[in-house]
Each structure stands twice: as structure tokens, then as C-alpha cells.
Amino acid sequence: MKLETTRFGVIDIREEEVITMPLGMPGFSDQKQFVLLDHKPDSPFQWYQSVQDPSLAFVVTDPFLFKPDYAVNLHKIVEELGWDQDVSGNHLKLYAVVNIPPGSPEKTTANLIGPVLMNLVTHEAVQVIIPDSRYSHKFPLA
């Protein structure tokens, strides 16, 4: 399948690479399909590119790379979502949405209070809000 993007031009993706977000991203509820694209080889960042809007892409990262003791109660979230997969396995993946201020990459932050949780079996994802979190939506990465 051909995907037109403003950052990468036209790229080929496989249908099974498409991740469906039934609720969309907060503020972008009409955007329901995304694909993960690598930023650069060996980069800790990826692009979470909208399939529907060529100009919409979020920078995401594995939060454990920057906060090894990051802890989220996945069992509770998975139960609330009705996902039946074994959360102790490799069926789930968390991503933190990253904010890189223009001209100030040293002020890059990650949203640890609202990670994107992906179900790698069903190719579904949801941005969850961790209630009563000790984390910040502006966790410094630099």
C-alpha cells in the first residue's frame, strides 16, 4: 500500500503494519490509523505517522530507554480495554509521545503520564492517561 507523507514522501507500507486507534489521539479523534516509521538507524525515536493525514506525525520513543524504572499497571489498563492478551508476554508495547521544541532540542520532553499502548496481536492502540501518576507530561529527555 502506498502512503503519502509530507516528511518522507510516498512510502510503501504493508497493510499489517497499520495500527488502528479506535478513539484516535486526543485532539485528533478523527485520525484512527497510524504506522510506525523509524527515524534513523540506531535512533531511540520513531515517527507515529497518520495514514489519513500526510502532514500529521508524532515523534515517539520507548519510555524505558530514558526512565528505566518507569512503571505502569498494564494489567488494569488491559482489563479496562477488554484486551485478553497475556500482558507478561511480548504482546504489548508502550510508547511515550515526544515534544521537541523548534530550535531547542536540548529541551526535548516525553509525555510519561499519557503513553500510547499498542497491542501487537490485534494492531490496536490507545493513548492512556495514568491517573494519580507520579510522572510528568514533560519528562526531560536531555
Each predicted region: which residue ranges?
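Long, compositionally biased stretches
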Residues: M1-K67, G89-A142
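Short active-site loop/helix that positions an aromatic residue
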Residues: K76-V87
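Extended catalytic/binding region for NAD+/ADP-ribose chemistry, centered on the ART fold
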Residues: D69-K76
